[in-house]
């Protein structure tokens, strides 16, 4: 079968990192191609090369059999390649039709918008997807699932032959997911090709025909989904045994350091758990399960409505992040660029930002020599690759930025270290270094909470694992009990703490 779209031998490098090396992707008419790989495998970079956001360093792109280069998202969109991003690009205050044809409104011979034609065309697009609502409805009145359908209708308005869906079900309910799958089957029957990017195994086996696997920026394989099992697919993605990739330190945890009882807050309902000295507690669950919210309520970044937290036997109340820090709880955010780092400031300034009390004299002036000494020590300990501590942190790679974010947390000498997605967007080499650092903290008696969407990471690094589902704790497992299947069952609510035995 001839591919609608072919990318072959794609290379793309950024300063200090090769994001793609010989990567390839084929998209066939009437078939769904899953694109899979761990975080940092190169999936997003490949999509940006495909849609013209990034220029490829080497390789070829064949569109409908012809060698092509797109010079930006507009040209790829007009050629017939549509992309539906994880974050929806719709304006809630406008109608569905206005969103679909934004910037391309139908104009009559008098130069005025032809509303009648625009709504009629939009209604036709919605009918193609078997949607029951009309295009004069405000987008803000729709559910997230229906908004996603509007994004698909918008893509179809460009006569798209290939549609890329990036984590399309992350914010959807089960019913909305089923509606999406019905639409995907409809698109297949119209001979459109679909690229489906997801980390959810169940969906890959339910809706996809083929799968392409990337690892460390390289093309690993293209296979028919029917010929694979979940285990063989994971093996292709990971490329090595779990224990080789995740160096687990087998130390017995100490006494209880943190005790959480019936904690409630925004997106968090009646959660209880304990954390011991020298223990890594993994927190697993799907997107929207409440993992990050739980950590922010614990740390003081979100309000606690009820429940108790005790640290080393003393009750602590955290009404703000400052309270969390003062009590020895450090939170390293999943979004280091928004919550964690000031990209225009230097490595030194970022690293010492929350620990300035330790480097301040009584009058408030800084002991610059002490600050430089401490920052230099952490740069060496963490093997941060930077020309100097005065380098702007925005110029460092993702892995080195993350090391600085973690080092900053440790400068305050915490008792509890919360790592939320610590290796997101970090290359494989830096991941291994971060895992080794985590083990070092564990050996020093630090209590660590590891929140991660990467199930192998949670399984490989944790001593114990708790699973969140819709704001509740849906399972707690020892390292020996935990498997991908068990964690996934708890994550989708099939297990609960009563029947998990």
Swiss-Prot record:
Family annotation (NCBIfam families): PRK10762.1
Protein keywords: ATP-binding, Cell inner membrane, Cell membrane, Membrane, Nucleotide-binding, Repeat, Sugar transport, Translocase, Transport
EC number(s) from the headed UniProt entry: 7.5.2.7
Topology versus the membrane: Peripheral membrane protein
Cystine connections: none
Annotated GO CC locations: plasma membrane
Species lineage: Bacteria, Pseudomonadati, Pseudomonadota, Gammaproteobacteria, Enterobacterales
Function as written in the Swiss-Prot or TrEMBL entry: Part of the ABC transporter complex RbsABC involved in ribose import. Responsible for energy coupling to the transport system.
Binding positions for ATP per the UniProt entry: 37-44
Enzymatic reactions: D-ribose(out) + ATP + H2O = D-ribose(in) + ADP + phosphate + H(+)
Keyword check for Cell membrane: yes
Gene of this entry: rbsA
Family: Belongs to the ABC transporter superfamily. Ribose importer (TC 3.A.1.2.1) family.
Subunit structure: The complex is composed of an ATP-binding protein (RbsA), two transmembrane proteins (RbsC) and a solute-binding protein (RbsB).
Highest taxon of source: Bacteria
Location(s) in or outside the cell: Cell inner membrane
Name by which UniProt lists this protein: Ribose import ATP-binding protein RbsA
Translocase in keyword set: yes
Broad class of enzyme this protein falls into: translocase
Organism: Salmonella paratyphi A (strain ATCC 9150 / SARB42)
Listed GO MF terms: ABC-type D-ribose transporter activity; ATP binding; ATP hydrolysis activity
């Amino acid at each position: 079968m001839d591919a609608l779209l072919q990318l072959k031998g794609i290379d793309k490098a950024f300063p200090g990192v090769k994001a793609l090396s010989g990567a390839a992707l084929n998209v066939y008419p009437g078939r769904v191609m899953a694109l899979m790989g761990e975080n940092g495998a190169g999936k997003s970079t490949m999509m940006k090369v495909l849609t013209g956001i990034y220029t490829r360093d080497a390789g070829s792109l064949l569109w409908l059999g012809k060698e092509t280069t797109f010079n930006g998202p507009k040209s790829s969109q007009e050629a017939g390649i549509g992309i539906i991003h994880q974050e929806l690009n719709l304006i809630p205050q406008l109608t569905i039709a206005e969103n679909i044809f934004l910037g391309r409104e139908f104009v009559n011979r008098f130069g005025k918008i032809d509303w009648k034609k625009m709504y009629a065309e939009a209604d036709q697009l919605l009918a193609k997807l078997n949607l029951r609502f009309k295009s004069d409805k405000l987008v803000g009145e729709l559910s997230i699932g229906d908004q996603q359908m509007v994004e698909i209708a918008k893509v179809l308005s460009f006569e798209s032959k290939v549609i890329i869906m990036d984590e399309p079900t992350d914010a959807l309910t089960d019913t909305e997911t089923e509606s999406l799958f019905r639409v995907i089957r409809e698109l297949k029957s119209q001979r459109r090709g679909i690229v489906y990017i997801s980390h959810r195994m169940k969906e890959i086996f339910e809706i996809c025909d083929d799968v392409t696997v990337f690892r460390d920026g390289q093309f690993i394989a293209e296979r028919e989904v029917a010929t694979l099992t979940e285990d063989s697919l994971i093996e292709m993605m990971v490329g090595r045994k779990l224990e080789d990739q995740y160096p687990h330190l087998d130390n017995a945890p100490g006494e209880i350091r943190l005790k959480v009882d019936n904690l409630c807050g925004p997106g968090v309902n009646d959660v209880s758990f304990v954390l011991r000295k020298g223990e890594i507690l993994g927190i697993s669950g799907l997107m929207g399960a409440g993992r990050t919210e739980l950590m922010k309520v614990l740390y003081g970044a979100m309000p606690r409505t009820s429940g108790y937290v005790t640290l080393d036997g003393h009750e602590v109340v955290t009404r703000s992040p400052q309270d969390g820090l003062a009590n020895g709880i450090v939170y390293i955010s999943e979004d280091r660029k928004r919550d964690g780092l000031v990209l225009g400031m230097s490595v030194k300034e970022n690293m010492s930002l929350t620990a300035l009390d330790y480097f301040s004299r009584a009058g408030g002036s800084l002991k610059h020599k002490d600050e430089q000494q401490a920052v230099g020590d952490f740069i060496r300990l963490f093997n941060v690759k930077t020309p100097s501590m005065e380098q702007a942190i925005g110029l460092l790679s993702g892995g080195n930025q993350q090391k600085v974010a973690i080092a900053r947390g440790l400068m305050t000498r915490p008792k509890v270290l919360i790592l939320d997605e610590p290796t997101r967007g970090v290359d494989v080499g830096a991941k291994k270094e971060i895992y080794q650092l985590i083990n070092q903290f564990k050996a020093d008696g630090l209590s660590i909470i590891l929140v991660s969407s990467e199930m192998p990471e949670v399984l490989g690094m944790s001593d114990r694992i708790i699973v969140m589902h819709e704001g509740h704790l849906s399972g707690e497992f020892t390292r020996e009990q935990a498997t991908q299947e068990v964690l996934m069952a708890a994550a989708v609510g099939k297990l609960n703490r009563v029947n998990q035995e």
